[in-house]
């Protein structure tokens, strides 16, 4: 998994709907994030971390934010 938004939401007893309301995005968008179909921009990851009161590294693997360049 690239991000752990789903896991952290569950730990905090928060729903996808709650997160979508907080961020002003559609529940469909949040659903794509939690299933790792697509990833939110880094600014959104930071906002999600704030909302859930966790560190950014609790939400996402480092490689997602800073992918290794293919040589």
Regions of interest found by a model, annotated:
Residues 1-5, 25, 42:
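Secretory-pathway ectodomains
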Residues 3-22:
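Short basic helix-loop element that most often maps to the first helix and adjoining turn
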Residues 7, 13, 32, 50, ...:
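Short, charged recognition helix plus adjacent turn
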Residues 18, 29, 58:
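Residues in the helix-turn-helix
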Residues 25-39:
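Recognition helix of helix-turn-helix/homeodomain-like DNA-binding domains
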Residues 43-58:
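DNA major-groove recognition helix of helix-turn-helix/homeodomain DNA-binding modules
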